[in-house]
Structure formats: C-alpha cells, structure tokens
C-alpha cells in the first residue's frame, strides 16, 4: 500500500530540519517524512570535505532560531556545523522521521486526486509516496557534479586535478606546490587551510578578482553576552545584532557602492605586503554585492599572502602543461596539484522532475510568490535562502509560512493552495538580482520574479519578515480552494 503523509520534505539539510521543527511545533497533528538522498543528514555540511570548510555567514543567524548557537566563535568549521545540525535533529526527535538513501526522482501533482505522488529510489528500487503538501528543501546546486570548465591540455598535466566538491580523503599535499583556480568563497577558504596543512606554496589564479571582507573569528559582543546573560537572552541579542549588521552593510553597499568599495580596498591594503597591487587583485569591476562578498576570518587570506606562503595571479589560462599552467600573458605556474575551485552547477529540486497531471512544469513560465511558492504549482513550497545573509534566516521564514498556510487551510476547510500568476499586471523580472557565474549559467531555466510584492524577491530579511510572518495569508494572489479527494492516509 502506498504511504501517504500530510507533508513530504525533500532534503535533510538546514532547510529540511527547520521545516520539520516548525511542523512539530505549530502543526503537531500533521504527519511528515523527510526524504534525503545521501547516507547522512546535513546537506552541504555533509557533502563538502575540503580543508578548512567553514561557514561564510555568522553562526548566530546560520544557526536555528530554536537552538541557540552558544559559542562566541561566529564563524564555524564544517564538522562543527554538521554536529550542530545532527544535534538539532536528535534533540527534537526529527531524526526518527528521516529516511536516508532515498533519492526523489520526480513529483507529480494530480488535480483529480488532489495530492502529490513522489517517486523515490531506495535500495536500488523505485517506490511511490503520496503527500498533501510538498516542501522542497534540496538546495540549489547539483550535488553530483561541480562546475568545471574545459581546460586545454588538462590531460597533459602530470599531477592531480581536483574539484573541491569531490575532495579525496587521502590527498597528501604536504610540501606540494598548489594552484587554486578561482577566487570565490571556496578558494578564499582553501588557501590559508592548505598552507596551514603543510603545502609548500599556494597560488590563487583568478580571471577576475572578488571582494573580500574581514571579520573577527570570535565575536567580541557575543563573548560578553554569553558570559553575563542567560543563554536564550544572549542568543536573542547575538542573533539580532548579527541580522542588523548584515542588513546594514548590504544596504550601505547598494546605496553607496563607491564608499563600500573604498572601505574594502583599504581594509585589504592594511593587511597585505607593502607595494601589493590591491586594485588589480582585489578590486573587481562590479560593485560590492553584485556578487556575494567573500569572508576572510581574522583576515587569514591576507595574512597568508603577507607571510609569503601564498600569492595571487590575475590572468587567464592558455593551457595546462605537464608541469602546471601556461597563462595568456606567457607566464607559467608550476604545480604539483591543481584545484579547480570554479564553482557550482545550479540545480533546483535536486534534479527531480516536477509535473502537474503528468505534464512537465515549465519553470520559466512560473513566477515566485514571496520567494517561496511558484505560480501554477499547488500545495508546494520551495526554500531558497538569502544570497546576502544567512540561508537559515529565509529557511525559518519559509517554514513558518508553510505552517501558517496549513493551519489556515484546516481552519477554513480548504485543501488546495495555489499562487495565481498575475499576468500583465506585474512585470516579469529575472529570478534574482544577483550575478555570479552559476546564476548566469542557469538564468534561462529559472522561474521569474515580479516587479512588485508579493511577487518581488528582494533579498531583504526585514521586508520578508513583515510579508511572510505578519501579512495575512488569505490575500488575492494566493488562491485557496476545496477539492476533497478520497485519500487513505497512512504514515509511520
């Protein structure tokens, strides 16, 4: 017999655990299951194993609202974050609802049956589970394959070529010369860690620079609040201080980009060797926050460069050679290991198909409602966190909204909710005002956002807080209906 749940959650990372906790807290009668394709929970924090893997957002906001992050260490390493997520699941009994090694292949909404049928692969076999509501918490990138461009001559290189998404556990890089291709968060994290791990020298090879900011590894305010305030009050203060700071610096960057650019350049110059060309190597052509700002805790990357253990080369690749990389300028970089920190491949729904009555949903024809539902797709929410703040802030709001919608439907006898596309009343805009490579490569396959609320995706926590947590649920863009289908519910 096909199992049926009130809610099926896809993904057991931060978003999935947040959704489960909110369901237990606010919709305690709802049955649910979490389907996780990997052998462990944790999502990103279970996948990436490269040296130095850490958060690039503060833990007071990357952590859950319901589980205080009690350390004053605001930037945490990957294993600590994985342990934190695992503890959150175990402490709240969420782990009992998680089915690992369950890969979702597709989800089909039936208007006639008024439910989702989710096709899952587990233990080499396919089976189906049905749900009244679907919560997609599978992130936004391809877990199987990172982005790696074609490099001429790659087969000629005598050393190892490694993508950080598939880091070998037994890699010995002590005493080796390493070239890291890329200048994003992964490269910025890797370089100091490789040096600390014994690499002879590391070169960051970038086609163009990235803005890099520096923050204390240990938050001085949190040190005091954690010492003198009760745990929950300290968490409240630390969290809201972090929210206010990140929001303010983002808004400042967008309104006064030249000021923010100058500030970042000055901060970098102070930490780098005398005569270092900061503009060439850390001065992008775009404005701050057109792409995500990278973080160097305690300025670790700058310190590594200053110590002579690492350097930066801004150039393009002509070809790989047997001993390294030849650049278009004619310079050659020798290397024992080349790491291609060249980014992600964007992928919504974890690669699963999304259909309605057996017909594929064309995402490019949909519009995001409050950044968490799609027009023309009933009884489904998708969690897509912030690009300019902690992912979890948005994940928590999405989880709250799911519960508000489910409770409203129960209270009023509805069983279907569907955002109605506004048509010509709202101009269609790109999914997000964000411009890194992985977004640009996927833009033609993404949903649209709208020119005004509730269709506009603003990447602003305070705007979303009002719109998602406090605005009324029963507004004209969200269509609630009754379609009672005879679904026999059984759940574990």
Curated annotation (Swiss-Prot):
Protein's cellular compartments: Cell membrane
Annotated cofactor note: Binds 1 FAD per subunit.
Induction summary: Repressed by the transcriptional regulator EthR.
Site (Transition state stabilizer): 292
Cofactor(s) required, per the database record: FAD
Residues binding FAD, per UniProt: 15, 36, 44-47, 56, 104
Keywords tagged on the record: Cell membrane, FAD, Flavoprotein, Membrane, Monooxygenase, NADP, Oxidoreductase
Catalyzed reactions: ethionamide + NADPH + O2 + H(+) = ethionamide S-oxide + NADP(+) + H2O
Record function comment: Monooxygenase able to convert a wide range of ketones to the corresponding esters or lactones via a Baeyer-Villiger oxidation reaction. Can act on long-chain aliphatic ketones (2-hexanone to 2-dodecanone) and on aromatic ketones (phenylacetone and benzylacetone). Is also able to catalyze enantioselective sulfoxidation of methyl-p-tolylsulfide. In vivo, likely functions as a BVMO, but the exact nature of the physiological substrate(s) remains to be established. Is responsible for the activation of several thiocarbamide-containing pro-drugs, such as ethionamide (ETH), isoxyl (ISO) and thiacetazone (TAC), into reactive species.
Record protein name field: FAD-containing monooxygenase EthA
Species of provenance: Mycolicibacterium smegmatis (strain ATCC 700084 / mc(2)155) (Mycobacterium smegmatis)
Lineage of the organism: Bacteria, Bacillati, Actinomycetota, Actinomycetes, Mycobacteriales
């Amino acid at each position: 017999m096909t199992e049926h749940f009130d809610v099926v959650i896809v993904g057991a990372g931060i978003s999935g655990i947040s959704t489960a906790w909110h369901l237990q807290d606010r919709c305690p009668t709802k049955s649910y299951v979490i389907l996780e394709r990997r052998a462990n929970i944790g999502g990103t924090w279970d996948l990436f194993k490269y040296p130095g893997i850490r958060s690039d957002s503060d833990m007071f906001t990357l952590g859950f609202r319901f589980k205080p992050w009690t350390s004053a260490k605001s930037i945490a390493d990957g294993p600590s974050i994985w342990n934190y997520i695992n503890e959150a699941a175990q402490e709240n009994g969420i782990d009992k609802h998680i089915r690992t090694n369950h890969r979702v292949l597709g989800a089909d909404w039936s208007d006639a049956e008024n439910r989702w049928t989710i096709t899952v692969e587990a233990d080499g076999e396919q089976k189906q589970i049905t749900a009244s509501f679907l919560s997609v918490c599978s992130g936004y990138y391809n877990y199987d394959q990172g982005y790696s461009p074609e490099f001429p001559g790659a087969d000629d290189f005598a050393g190892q070529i490694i993508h950080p998404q598939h880091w070998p556990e037994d890699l010995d890089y002590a005493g080796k010369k390493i070239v890291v291709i890329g200048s994003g968060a992964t490269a910025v994290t890797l370089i100091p860690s490789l040096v600390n791990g014994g690499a002879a020298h590391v070169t960051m090879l970038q086609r163009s620079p990235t803005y890099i900011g520096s923050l204390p590894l240990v938050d001085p305010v949190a040190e005091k609040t954690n010492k003198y305030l009760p745990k929950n009050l300290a968490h409240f203060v630390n969290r809201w201080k972090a929210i206010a700071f990140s929001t303010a610096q983002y808004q400042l960057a967008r309104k006064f980009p030249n000021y923010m650019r100058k500030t970042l350049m000055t901060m970098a110059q102070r930490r780098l060797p005398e005569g270092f060309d900061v503009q060439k190597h850390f001065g992008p052509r775009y404005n701050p926050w057109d792409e995500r700002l990278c973080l160097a805790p305690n300025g670790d990357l700058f310190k590594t460069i200053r110590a002579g253990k690492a350097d930066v080369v801004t150039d393009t690749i002509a070809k790989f050679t047997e001993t390294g990389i030849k650049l278009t300028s004619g310079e050659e970089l020798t290397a024992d290991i080349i790491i291609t920190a060249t980014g992600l491949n964007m992928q919504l729904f974890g690669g699963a198909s999304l259909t309605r009555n057996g017909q594929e949903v064309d995402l490019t024809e949909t519009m995001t409602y409050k950044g968490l539902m799609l027009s023309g797709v009933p009884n489904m929410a998708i969690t897509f966190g912030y690009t300019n703040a902690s992912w979890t802030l948005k994940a928590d709001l999405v989880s709250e909204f799911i519960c508000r919608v489910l409770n409203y439907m129960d209270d009023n006898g509805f069983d279907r909710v569907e955002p109605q596309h506004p048509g010509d009343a709202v101009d269609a805009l790109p999914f997000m005002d964000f411009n890194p490579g992985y977004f640009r490569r996927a833009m033609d396959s993404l949903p649209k956002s709208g020119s005004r609320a509730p269709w506009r995706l603003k990447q602003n926590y305070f705007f979303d807080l009002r719109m998602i947590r406090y605005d009324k649920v029963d507004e004209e863009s969200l269509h609630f209906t009754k379609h009672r289908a005879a679904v026999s519910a059984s759940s574990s």
